[in-house]
């Protein structure tokens, strides 16, 4: 779930006060509730701090419904962040949710309970909006042509763009955590689980021939892409100043992580312990899309859907 906010004395479409303004945005995916505090001035912004709560909400989805306990868990996280925002006197707040509330059957019930408990109206953005917001966020840092990829816990967004302009986009109901829950029996996938993972990915992320155009460059955002870079920097001896991965490095890393060797699990535990169960499924999605577009290089952006959600709102206020 995510959020951004506006001053109480400023209406959408009007020019905001000239003083520096603080904005906060919160996002919850299947596992986490995120808080990000921004400071904006004119057409620029920078992140003051980020915070997250490990909510474990995926464990509360039963038969496609988020249980009462899961909704209560979400409310508790939001109330924790509301206390922080009240202490800091932040007056511009918006909350939005992605696949976490989009892909359940009782979305309206969850939204109603969350509003009653927290006072927040949560905007559930569509898969297409999530794809375009993620792309817009990445474009705040990068001005490139190629394909954009955001692997979340429950969905994967792909945007093809040219010269900073999106050409087309798609959202797929498959993510690192949902894939893990569907295909993996233990913490790390064995040979049978790897076969199920690859089959599920190829069947779900299946673009038409007309939609597939070879792109040498792939831009990645989100936790899976950042974790891939972090592990590649260690395993492939990439400089910490480098924010890209080649197809050869990605394939070598995937082969190592899927090898079943203790050194592979040790590497994940040392660098990305909280992703011990979801990293391999996410990496296999990344590898599939990489080869689908014939990409030669992955560039990781520090901005994503939250900054993309922030940007159009901020533009409307100026």
Language-model regions: role of each:
Residues 37, 58-88, 100-145, 160-163, ...:
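Helical "lid/coupling" subdomains associated with nucleotide-phosphate turnover
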């Amino acid at each position: 779930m995510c959020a951004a906010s506006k001053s109480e004395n400023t209406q959408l479409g009007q020019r905001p006060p000239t003083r520096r303004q603080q904005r906060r945005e919160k996002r919850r995916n299947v596992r986490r509730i995120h808080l990000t505090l921004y400071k904006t001035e004119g057409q620029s912004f920078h992140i003051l701090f980020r915070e997250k709560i490990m909510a474990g909400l995926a464990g509360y989805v039963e038969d496609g419904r988020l249980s009462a306990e899961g909704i209560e868990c979400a409310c508790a996280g939001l109330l924790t962040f509301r206390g922080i925002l009240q202490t800091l006197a932040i007056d511009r707040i918006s909350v939005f949710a992605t696949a976490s509330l989009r892909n359940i059957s009782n979305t309206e019930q969850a939204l109603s309970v969350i509003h009653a408990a927290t006072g927040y109206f949560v905007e559930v953005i569509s898969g297409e909006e999530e794809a375009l917001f993620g792309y817009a966020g990445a474009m705040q840092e990068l001005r490139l042509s190629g394909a954009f990829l955001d692997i979340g816990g429950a969905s994967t967004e792909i945007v093809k763009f040219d010269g900073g302009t999106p050409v087309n986009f798609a959202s797929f109901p498959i993510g690192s955590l949902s894939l893990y829950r569907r295909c993996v029996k233990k913490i790390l996938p064995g040979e049978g689980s790897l076969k199920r993972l690859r089959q599920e990915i190829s069947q779900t992320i299946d673009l038409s021939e007309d939609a597939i155009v070879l792109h040498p460059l792939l831009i990645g955002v989100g936790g899976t892409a950042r974790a891939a870079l972090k592990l590649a920097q260690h395993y492939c001896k990439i400089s910490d100043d480098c924010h890209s991965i080649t197809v050869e490095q990605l394939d070598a890393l995937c082969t190592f992580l899927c090898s079943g060797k203790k050194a592979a699990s040790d590497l994940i535990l040392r660098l990305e312990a909280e992703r011990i169960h979801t990293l391999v499924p996410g990496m296999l999605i990344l590898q599939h899309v990489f080869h689908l577009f014939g990409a030669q290089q992955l560039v990781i952006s520090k901005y994503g859907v939250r900054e993309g959600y922030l940007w159009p709102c901020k533009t409307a206020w100026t």
